[in-house]
Design a protein with these regions (language model features):
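C-terminal cap/linker of serine protease catalytic domains
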Residues: 121-190
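Terminal peptide-recognition signature
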Residues: 1, 5, 9, 45-47, ...
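Alpha-helical protein-protein interaction scaffolds
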Residues: 185-188, 201-213
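A structural microfeature
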Residues: 36, 120-121
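Short, well-ordered loop/turn sites that connect or cap secondary structure elements
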Residues: 2, 15, 61-65, 113-114
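Short solvent-exposed coil/turn linkers within tandem alpha-helical repeat scaffolds
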Residues: 193-203
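Flexible, gly/ser-rich surface segments that form the specificity/activation loops bordering the active-site cleft
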Residues: 53-108, 123-134, 149
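Catalytic-histidine neighborhood of serine endopeptidases
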Residues: 2-42, 136-137
Length: 213
């Protein structure tokens, strides 16, 4: 959903994972570097990979009785047609699209696009309910300095990304001190990359090196 490697996908495959790899439509593998927010109710997560990506265009408007296409990166599954039968709003501005399609839960997490190729959301088949959750919902996730304590994100061992502001990022860096060595190392490297002139990152790195020795 961005040119700098920010992605969205279903959350359930991340639960209990200590690492994750995504495969793009060219077959290239990318390690998930950090989580940027998740919602268990709508089964969606936002995360960062280290790669330049071509962002997908997100649909801003979805209407009932319109065509949709369920698309994957796998050559084994050609685009499958669907129909948007109903559109419900949640949190006032995001679309939850109810679909009619023959596609089963094997393609859960696939892109659902309109006739213009714009992304309506991520596909979900749960018993008799087939739907698409607005990808813009995950796009708008914002992490804070305390996001490491979020109950949903704690279901996954992958590191939580640092917030954009220096104040919140400093809090997150401090909280990472009691995490695993790899978690701390990732947080420190991200902090130094974002704020190379601040001493906090170098002090945290020095403390990490001491504990290694």
């Amino acid at each position: 959903i961005s040119a700098d490697g920010v992605c969205v996908s279903p959350w359930k495959p991340f639960i209990g994972a200590s690492r994750a790899v995504v495969i793009d439509n060219k077959g290239q593998k990318h390690n998930v570097e950090a989580l940027m927010g998740a919602n268990g109710i709508y089964d969606i997560v936002k995360f960062q990979i280290q790669s330049s990506t071509t962002p997908a265009a997100l649909a801003t408007n979805v209407t009932a009785n319109s065509n949709a296409w369920i698309v994957t990166t796998s050559k084994s599954y050609p685009p499958a047609k669907a129909m948007v039968t109903k559109v419900e709003k949640f949190m006032e501005k995001y679309n939850y699209s109810v679909l009619t399609t023959d596609v089963d839960d094997k393609l859960n997490g696939a892109i659902v696009a309109n006739d213009k190729g714009q992304v309506i959301g991520l596909y979900s088949s749960n018993n008799s309910i087939k739907s698409a959750t607005d990808a813009a919902f995950a796009r708008d996730f914002v992490i804070s300095g305390l996001s490491q304590n979020d109950l949903t994100l704690r279901e996954c061992a992958i590191r939580v990304a640092l917030p954009a502001s220096v104040e919140e990022a400093t809090i997150a860096l401090m909280l990472s001190a009691d995490k695993s060595e790899s978690y701390r190392d990732g947080a420190i490297k991200e902090f130094l990359g974002k704020f190379p002139t601040l001493n906090d990152g170098y002090l945290a790195n020095a403390n990490l090196l001491i504990t290694k020795n």
